[in-house]
Amino acid sequence: MSSLTHFDAQGQAHMVDVGAKPATHRIAVAEGRIIMQPATLAIIQSGTAKKGDVLGIARIAGIMAAKKTSDLIPLCHPLALTRVAVEFDLLSDVSSVRCVATVETVGPTGVEMEALTAVQVALLTVYDMCKAVDKGMVMEGIRVLEKLGGKTNPSR
């Protein structure tokens, strides 16, 4: 097992120096889902939520969150993102909304934190917009599906 990179020899937190690393094309894909009552999913599907277009607003929130990740995660590097895509699947059989975020950059460090942040904030936005009708929603399964680029994960 490798050591934690965000701590120095004295155990103090620090931002990893990526200055000498080459800029490469990097991609990360993350997913998660929010489980809800079937009636809540029906409201999202029909577009009749009182606060507006739930998935449209959640998509924008996810994109904004990816761009602000370094403001939220203390030791995360600010990155110039070249692409952020946030997509949703409505899963009637399990009464949930699945979110998938794909983030890309050309830089010295990966974008998995940005992809994870996009998914989390998009799902939080779904929760916020639907909590008036369903306070029992649960987010789960947030994880990185794919990471490409850099020396440990060559680009496709």
UniProtKB/Swiss-Prot annotation:
Pfam families from the UniProt entry: MoaC
Reaction(s) catalysed by this chain's protein: (8S)-3',8-cyclo-7,8-dihydroguanosine 5'-triphosphate = cyclic pyranopterin phosphate + diphosphate
Enzyme Commission designation: 4.6.1.17
Assembly and binders: Homohexamer; trimer of dimers.
Function comment: Catalyzes the conversion of (8S)-3',8-cyclo-7,8-dihydroguanosine 5'-triphosphate to cyclic pyranopterin monophosphate (cPMP).
Gene3D superfamilies: Molybdopterin cofactor biosynthesis C (MoaC) domain
GO biological process: Mo-molybdopterin cofactor biosynthetic process
Name of the molecule in the record: Cyclic pyranopterin monophosphate synthase
Active site, per annotation: D128
Pathway, per record: Cofactor biosynthesis; molybdopterin biosynthesis
Superkingdom of origin: Bacteria
Residues reported to bind substrate: L75, C76, H77, M113, E114
Gene this chain is encoded by: moaC
